[in-house]
Amino acid sequence: MALARCVLAVILGVLSEVARADPVLHSPLHRPHPSPPRSQHAHYLPSSRRPPRTPRFPLPPRAPAAQRPQLLSTRHTPPTISRRCGAGEPWGNATNLGVPCLHWDEVPPFLERSPPASWAELRGQPHNFCRSPGGAGRPWCFYRNAQGKVDWGYCDCGQGPALPVIRLVGGKSGHEGRVELYHAGQWGTICDDQWDDADAEVICRQLGLSGIAKAWHQAHFGEGSGPILLDEVRCTGNELSIEQCPKSSWGEHNCGHKEDAGVSCAPLTDGVIRLSGGKSVHEGRLEVYYRGQWGTVCDDGWTEMNTYVACRLLGFKYGKQSSVNHFEGSSRPIWLDDVSCSGKEASFIQCSRRQWGRHDCSHREDVGLTCYPDSDGHRLSPGFPIRLMDGENKREGRVEVFVSGQWGTICDDGWTDKHAAVICRQLGYKGPARARTMAYFGEGKGPIHMDNVKCTGNEKALADCVKQDIGRHNCRHSEDAGVICDYYEKKTSGHGNKETLSSGCGLRLLHRRQKRIIGGNNSLRGAWPWQASLRLKSTHGDGRLLCGATLLSSCWVLTAAHCFKRYGNNSRSYAVRVGDYHTLVPEEFEQEIGVQQIVIHRNYRPDSSDYDIALVRLQGSGEQCARLSTHVLPACLPLWRERPQKTASNCHITGWGDTGRAYSRTLQQAAVPLLPKRFCKERYKGLFTGRMLCAGNLQEDNRVDSCQGDSGGPLMCEKPDETWVVYGVTSWGYGCGIKDTPGVYTRVPAFVPWIKSVTSL
């Protein structure tokens, strides 16, 4: 009985719908929407009570069989006929309350769960026009209600579309193309006057396309053939439809089809970039998309090639790095650091970089860019992209040029401050520039692209200075050219507080990071301010470096006694250089001072390595010999009989000695562990005494040693108070970097009373 009642109720309901059907369209009579919530309909229940089921969609009414052929024969009708939306025409795309319809391809789950077979024609359709599936019933569409849920509603197509109908033409995909509007019965284009990304954002939103909206000009996707319908479109980017944007009247313009506007609505994927916070679309803070969130890029190691790649990926031809202070501040995450692009990347994340989110930066170091199209006349970096490599910061380094797909260097023949001025100008720096020669920032590894570059100092770019064929040279990488930009800023910060300089020892005022002699790497300028060198005067040769040394005060230097074995202890034969970094390039903090006195330990014998220690008094008046600065500071002495193996950590050796290939021109540094006394005794037997210590990394693949050119140089260790103490003087060893043969050093704590008695320190 219950089943019979249910069947009867269904039949009566169907008959009721047929009785209420419109005699012309055979569709349910019009009713306003959205209807007030009604508890009997699951679709309108509050979300907390709503069962997980498909909304009740408008099903086609069951018409008498005799009338069905008439329905099937209905053809597309013009928009002047009331309440008609042709099955293939772009008429209505909003509900009868003016709510925009969703695109049919945005709601496939609902279509898949809907029973009528005629609805299959709507699946995957990339438009939002109202439809009557199968030609039955009133046209309707999906929309999103006030609660953000997918709903459906009827359309009234009598006046054509409630929102302008838009399509993209000429692109490689449905996400890009020339913008065309349907108006007054025909398709037409938009003029690109004042067309920008804000306009593109509205177009993409109206088309239901998410992602990055970008405006394109000058008929980028080809010229249209219909009328030009709109001009001077000025959207803010927040509008739901282009109809809401300020614009010219329909059909009013002063353009040709060469100015047809286009857009691209690129899907958001990891690595997509944009410019944000600028006053126009071609400038701003560089931001990259990752895991659903935009973030910034740190400028550590940022080069002109990175700028070129970023601007090219954004659709521009050229660009320059800009101060991020010109753009709005950011509170977004810093996604990328140490980015390095080669110029061939098709995506920004193909550039070399740190892992996502790994950085040591603040937002003050965000990359800012200004990009320019080819037609703008703003080509600020013409010719060869350039970059600075292996400097202490982005304002200095070895000059490298990108030619024929490969980075290479410039030979320093004739290289002067005028050349440096041009390089720095091309990179966007305005301060004084200084040239550096003789591979001051290390030797490059690629080809040498240029030689005999001729600059007057007034050129805008390096390309204006090249007079010789690319690739033609007679140089080696030991002659690679470099520059320092904004030079005065570095110099004025270099003198420090006079009270601190005169009263302290063991202070490293300029070290910022540690790179790692054999197993070592270039140090930073001024990072080891007590490093000195003992040099022969020209009467005994070419003034070459003889030994390393350690500055103990303005007038006293510590070194090894064996340094005087060959040329004797005549003070007039030697000079001491402090504040040096590159042995062949004069620098502002460098001082070369004559020797007044040489004091060799009385127990030293030339045929032995014991007591291998000496003191050198510099020429000067009173206690003022070397001028102290951030690059010239004394080291601290240890306590008498102090055991560095127990009290010291973080030990380093420094010098200009053997690097494993040749003697270095730039100061080297290497971290070494202090080794147990018993190990050294077992290895060197009776040659190792209590006045010695040994240090070095003994692993086969990571051996670090101090070699011939570093004789007399310091072995420094850091104490808990962050001061540095000289615990050793480089003395002797078996070869350089040979397995199980650590370097041997004179143990300075054993000689503290002698040092103080000689120097009165």
Swiss-Prot record:
Glycans are attached at residues 93, 521, 569. GO terms for molecular function: peptidase activity; serine-type endopeptidase activity. Transmembrane segments: none annotated. One of its GO terms (biological process) is proteolysis. Its main location: secreted. Plays a role in neuronal plasticity and the proteolytic action may subserve structural reorganizations associated with learning and memory operations. PANTHER family: DELETED IN MALIGNANT BRAIN TUMORS 1 PROTEIN, SCAVENGER RECEPTOR DOMAIN-CONTAINING. This is Neurotrypsin. CDD domains: Tryp_SPc. Residues 517-760 form the Peptidase S1 domain. The lineage of its organism: Eukaryota, Metazoa, Chordata, Craniata, Vertebrata. It is an enzyme of class 3 (hydrolase). Belongs to the peptidase S1 family. Residues 166-267, 273-373, 386-487 form the SRCR domain. Residues 505-516 are annotated as: Zymogen activation region. Disulfide bonds join 85-157, 101-141, 130-155, 191-255, 204-265, 235-245, 298-361, 311-371, 341-351, 411-475, 424-485, 455-465, 505-636, 547-563, 651-717, 680-694, 707-736. InterPro entries: Kringle, Kringle-like, Kringle_CS, Kringle_sf, Peptidase_S1_PA, Peptidase_S1_PA_chymotrypsin, Peptidase_S1A, SRCR. GO terms for cellular component: axon; cytoplasmic vesicle; dendrite; glutamatergic synapse; plasma membrane; presynapse; Schaffer collateral - CA1 synapse; synapse. Pfam families: SRCR, Trypsin. Keywords: Disulfide bond, Glycoprotein, Hydrolase, Kringle, Protease, Repeat, Secreted, Serine protease, Signal. The record marks 516-517 as: Reactive bond homolog. It comes from Rattus norvegicus (Rat). Residues 1-21 form the signal peptide.
